[in-house]
């Protein structure tokens, strides 16, 4: 996920350019001083020396530590790349920008596949975006600054003698190059589509590479640097009603909702993800939908610029590098015709079941070292096969009981990280830019989950004094709990109110029965840990309780609930779910899978709250029980 650091962090990481000839300055912040010192670490290195050992610290992951397998997790996030190769690419796009200056005004050219195995979006590679240098001078990288180490990418700021800064995004090698290739190709094309067709402000992408055979020696995206502040700076989800910051609160809801409105404004012709049409030259034509991505395009430069291909939604690719891509994955990735929206759910279930079966087979063959109980994997198979089985019946796609059902089923663009953390407000013009389209896909609005920053599944409280009996007589601790529920309810209500203002035909997607019907699929999409298959089961069992009512109201396809659960199945589920909740409560940092921000980790380690074990793992010291 892209994060442009908040004011103070990014500025601390960036200093003036080096004046040494042939040298660049690499800047990173010491892990132990990230939030204490304003002085970054500086390393000077010769541009031509790709093997300079002093550079290694610049590429190491430093923003957090793990309680288990810390060394291995950090090695997975080592992002060494060729600075010399980056410099060559910058010179190449500078030459392309001068050539593009001769192109007719308003002409939108297709991406150019370069001989060095990179791709240039020449439509963006123009002098006003790239900058200028003196004749006979070459582009020179002067300063590299590590400004963010995110969940999926390392983000570097690249300063040059063009008087322009760029952003270099390097994905962590957590998955194989095939996965990264699809992900990058689709993300770049989707941002291009959002910019040129939907009118959404995004950082302009200049060049990208999908594997390590290019001069950078890593998959990468080189894009525009946006100077500004994250919209998250203004978001306070627990703000008091009528606060002096109410305008900021309202503006955050409005800005994010306006982006969503643009994303879903155009009905598309298939479900999957967006790619450039000329990706067909190197790929299998059967991967792509032959018909136009949308109807009615009159601009010849945009006709056939994009196609719908396999979905890159994260849940379909996560932890599946061990699968045979062509035999075990590709059949479940789409694209899917717009007449078959529920195939998305069905294929999600079938793919996850296939993944669990393969992991069991590998474990039985002794070819897998992962520490996973076979029972958990077997339970996952049952859960995901149930999800696939119920998929065709979850929604009656011809029902009249849900207003505007066909609008809700139409393919529309979905941004999986629509969040104030992914919106940066330009410093000069105060314009909002939407970042990080990784994992974007086209799916029906009825299957799109709410943004995480306002999502709330707990008890709804709309008015504290009306909904809570004798609220004023409660203890302060009880009042705080109810106030928390009220504010979370309010946030979600304000979001849905803005959705109704912007897209009234889509508002029934947030009706409680519709939310419940899609909840098993959403639980599958949002699953983070092995045990969270239990949340899918929980959603399915909740549906079982109300299925008859939904059938009577023509919301579902079958009168009888399609799945069979024995009394023993339900009792075992209740017991396992209780154990999961107890684990989340009792296990420190379970919600982040044992990851701890580095400043907090250092404080806990120095205070003795975290203790290092002989095997390199860490344990959290439990406080002694009081007598």
Curated annotation (Swiss-Prot):
GO cellular component: mitochondrion
Major site of localization recorded for this protein: mitochondrion
InterPro entries: Kinase-like_dom_sf, Mito_inheritance_9
Alphabetized UniProt keyword annotations: Mitochondrion, Transit peptide
Transit peptide stretch: 1-43
Subcellular location: Mitochondrion
Domain of life where this protein originates: Eukaryota
Family statement drawn from the similarity comment of this UniProt entry: Belongs to the AIM9 family.
Name of the protein described by the UniProt record: Altered inheritance of mitochondria protein 9, mitochondrial
Organism: Saccharomyces cerevisiae (strain Lalvin EC1118 / Prise de mousse)
Higher taxonomy: Eukaryota, Fungi, Dikarya, Ascomycota, Saccharomycotina
Gene: AIM9
């Amino acid at each position: 996920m892209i994060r442009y650091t908040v004011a103070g962090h990014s500025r601390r990481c960036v200093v003036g350019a080096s004046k040494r000839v042939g040298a660049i300055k690499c800047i990173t912040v010491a892990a132990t001083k990230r939030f204490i010192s304003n002085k970054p670490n500086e390393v000077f290195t010769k541009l031509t020396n790709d093997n300079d050992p002093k550079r290694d610290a610049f590429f190491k992951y430093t923003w957090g530590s793990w309680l288990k397998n810390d060394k291995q997790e950090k090695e997975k996030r080592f992002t060494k790349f060729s600075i010399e190769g980056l410099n060559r690419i910058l010179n190449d796009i500078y030459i392309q920008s001068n050539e593009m200056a001769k192109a007719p005004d308003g002409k939108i050219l297709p991406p150019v596949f370069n001989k060095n195995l990179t791709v240039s979006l020449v439509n963006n590679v123009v002098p006003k975006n790239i900058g200028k240098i003196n004749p006979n001078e070459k582009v020179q990288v002067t300063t590299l600054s590590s400004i963010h180490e995110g969940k999926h990418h390392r983000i570097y700021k690249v300063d040059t003698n063009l008087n322009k800064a760029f952003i270099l995004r390097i994905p962590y090698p957590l998955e194989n190059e095939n996965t990264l290739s699809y992900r990058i190709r689709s993300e770049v094309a989707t941002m291009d589509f959002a910019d040129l067709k939907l009118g959404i402000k995004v950082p302009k992408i200049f060049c990208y590479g999908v594997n390590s055979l290019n001069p950078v020696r890593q998959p990468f995206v080189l894009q525009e640097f946006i100077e500004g502040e994250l919209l998250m700076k203004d978001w306070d989800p627990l703000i008091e009603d009528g606060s002096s910051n109410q305008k900021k609160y309202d503006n955050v809801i409005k800005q994010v909702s306006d982006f969503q409105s643009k994303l879903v404004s155009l009905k598309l012709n298939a479900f999957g993800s967006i790619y450039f049409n000329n990706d067909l030259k190197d790929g299998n034509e059967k991967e792509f939908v032959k018909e136009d991505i949308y109807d009615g395009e009159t601009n010849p430069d945009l006709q056939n610029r994009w196609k719908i291909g396999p979905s890159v939604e994260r849940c379909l690719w996560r932890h599946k590098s061990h699968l045979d891509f062509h035999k075990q994955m590709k059949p479940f990735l789409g694209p899917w015709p717009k007449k078959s929206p529920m195939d998305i759910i069905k294929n999600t279930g079938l793919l996850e079941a296939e993944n669990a079966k393969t992991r069991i087979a590998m474990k039985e063959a002794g070819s897998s070292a992962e520490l996973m109980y076979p029972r958990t994997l077997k339970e996952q198979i049952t859960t995901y096969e149930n999800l696939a089985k119920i998929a065709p019946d979850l929604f009656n796609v011809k029902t009249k009981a849900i207003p505007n059902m066909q609008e809700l089923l139409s393919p529309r663009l979905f941004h999986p990280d629509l969040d104030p953390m992914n919106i940066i407000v330009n410093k000069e013009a105060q314009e909002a830019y939407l970042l990080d389209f990784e994992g974007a896909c086209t799916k029906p609005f009825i299957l799109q989950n709410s943004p995480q920053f306002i999502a709330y599944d707990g008890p709804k409280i709309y008015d504290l004094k009306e909904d809570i009996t004798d609220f004023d007589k409660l203890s302060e601790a009880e009042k705080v709990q109810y106030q928390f529920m009220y504010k979370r309810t309010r946030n979600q209500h304000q979001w849905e109110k803005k959705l109704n203002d912007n897209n009234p035909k889509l508002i029934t997607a947030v009706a409680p029965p519709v939310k419940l019907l899609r909840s098993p699929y959403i639980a599958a999409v949002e699953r983070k840990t092995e045990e969270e298959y239990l949340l899918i089961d929980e959603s399915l069992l909740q549906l079982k309780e109300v299925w008859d009512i939904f059938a009577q109201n023509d919301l579902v396809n079958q009168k009888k609930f399609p799945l069979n659960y024995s009394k023993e199945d339900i009792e075992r589920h209740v017991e396992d779910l209780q154990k999961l909740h107890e684990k989340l409560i009792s296990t420190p940092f379970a919600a982040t899978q044992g990851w701890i921000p580095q400043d907090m980790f250092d404080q806990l380690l120095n205070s003795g709250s975290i203790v290092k074990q002989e095997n390199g793992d860490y344990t959290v010291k439990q406080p002694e029980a009081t007598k």
